[in-house]
């Protein structure tokens, strides 16, 4: 029998649990604004705007300084390294802006995906080297949670046992290092929506992946109450011809979570996985209305599904600032309702809100 060598003091555990609960308090979710410089380039390019540091700063400021209606909706904001050290026009560092609105500051700490040799195009995620030192510095600079993304693909022979095991272990090492530094880890094992697989296949793979992730977290002595999970919803592949209702997607998603995610986990913050803004809200709402026992907060950690309409409305023009913020506020309010099972689609979502945000083989 293994002997217990406590990884964390009671004080450390309380701090981690408190942070996790603040992020997913009722009605709150996460704004994922942690696109890498390469990823934000694609977003800016789509509106004909140059990818300069100032444009990136201005756009992030637009989101972070939206009016106080978003305060009850946004429990945390995930930033990219560059953004953590940028300032608003009034001279306040962005972390201070986020905290002044009741949000917790998060930071993306992985260094991207790399190929796993000998597999059919599968990947693992790099960034463990020097992570402890980086976490210690980020904590000093105001960040209280972190995100690390692993990616798995559904194919005829994927995900392989190797890819599942390797990614589960790298997530567990990352989580351990974060917790030692007082940072709540968001564990993100994303199963991509690419492919023609049906709902059942996605559910099966999601269950296998999550079971492996929580086995690894246990092996690495992770304090689950001080973690959040950022999974995909269980959906059919983008090329699947069969159509499913929002209720079927919700039932498959909640069932997969119930079979694999311990109730000790504080919250589940779904990624939007290229769903349209409207679809991401409707599915989140259906998940929260699903008639099964759900012991965790079930909320959002959306990037494009909170930003797409705002980005379009902004169009890279300073004079569109207010209009863009209005679009962002709309989505934040919609998702705040959805994570409480109280969202009723108005039926008048703009064209941008209903547009699929799917990017094949999506790499941040």
Swiss-Prot record:
Beta-D-fructose 1,6-bisphosphate binds at residues 43, 272-274, 301, 304. Asn-361 in form alpha is deaminated to Asp in form beta. Changing residue 304 to A: Reduces activity 400-fold. Changing residue 129 to V: Alters protein-protein interactions, leading to a dimeric protein. The record marks 147, 362 as: Alkylation inactivates the enzyme. The modification N6-acetyllysine is found at residues 42, 108, 111, 330. It is found in: Cytoplasm, Myofibril, Sarcomere, I band; Cytoplasm, Myofibril, Sarcomere, M line. The modification Phosphoserine is found at residues 36, 39, 46, 132, 272. InterPro entries: Aldolase_I_AS, Aldolase_TIM, FBA_I. Changing residue 35 to A: Reduces activity 14-fold. Its EC number is 4.1.2.13. Disulfide bonds: none annotated. Changing residue 188 to A: Reduces activity over 100-fold. The keyword Transport does not apply. SUPFAM superfamilies: Aldolase (SSF51569). There is a cross-link at residue 42 (Glycyl lysine isopeptide (Lys-Gly) (interchain with G-Cter in SUMO2)). The modification N6-(2-hydroxyisobutyryl)lysine is found at residues 99, 147. Signal peptide: none annotated. The active site is at 188 (proton acceptor), 230 (schiff-base intermediate with dihydroxyacetone-p). PROSITE patterns: ALDOLASE_CLASS_I. In vertebrates, three forms of this ubiquitous glycolytic enzyme are found, aldolase A in muscle, aldolase B in liver and aldolase C in brain. Alkylation of Arg-43 inactivates the enzyme. PANTHER family: FRUCTOSE-BISPHOSPHATE ALDOLASE. Belongs to the class I fructose-bisphosphate aldolase family. This is Fructose-bisphosphate aldolase A. The gene is ALDOA.
């Amino acid at each position: 029998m293994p002997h217990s060598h406590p990884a964390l003091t009671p004080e450390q555990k309380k701090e981690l649990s408190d942070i996790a609960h603040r992020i997913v308090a009722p009605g709150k979710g996460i704004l994922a604004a942690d696109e890498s410089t390469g990823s934000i380039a694609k977003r800016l390019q789509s509106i004909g705007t140059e990818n300069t540091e100032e444009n990136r700063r201005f756009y992030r400021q637009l989101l972070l300084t939206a009016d106080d209606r978003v305060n009850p909706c946004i429990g945390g904001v995930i930033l990219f390294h560059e953004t953590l050290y940028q300032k608003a026009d009034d001279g306040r560092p962005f972390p201070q802006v986020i905290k002044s609105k009741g949000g917790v500051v998060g930071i993306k700490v992985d260094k991207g995906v790399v190929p796993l040799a000998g597999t059919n195009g599968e990947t693992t995620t790099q960034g463990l080297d020097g992570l402890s030192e980086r976490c210690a510095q980020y904590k000093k600079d105001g960040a209280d949670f972190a995100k690390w993304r692993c990616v798995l693909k559904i194919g005829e022979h994927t995900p392989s046992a190797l890819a599942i095991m390797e990614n589960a272990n790298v997530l567990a090492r990352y989580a351990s290092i974060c917790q030692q530094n007082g940072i709540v880890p968001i564990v993100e094992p994303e199963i991509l929506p690419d492919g023609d697989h049906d709902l059942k296949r996605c559910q099966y793979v999601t269950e296998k992946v999550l079971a492996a992730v929580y086995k690894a977290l246990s092996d690495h002595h992770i304090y689950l109450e001080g973690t959040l999970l950022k999974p995909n919803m269980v959906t059919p592949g983008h090329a699947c011809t069969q159509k499913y209702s929002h209720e079927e997607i919700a039932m498959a998603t909640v069932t997969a979570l119930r079979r694999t995610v311990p109730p000790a986990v504080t919250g589940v913050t779904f990624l939007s996985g290229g769903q349209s803004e409207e679809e991401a809200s409707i599915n989140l709402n259906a998940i929260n209305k699903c008639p099964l026992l759900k012991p965790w907060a079930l909320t959002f950690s959306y990037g494009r599904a909170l930003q797409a309409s705002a980005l379009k409305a902004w169009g890279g023009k300073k004079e569109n600032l207010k209009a863009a913020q209005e679009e962002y506020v709309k989505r934040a309010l919609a998702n705040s309702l959805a994570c409480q099972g109280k969202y009723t689609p108005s039926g008048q979502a703009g064209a941008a809100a209903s547009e699929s945000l799917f990017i094949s083989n999506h790499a941040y």
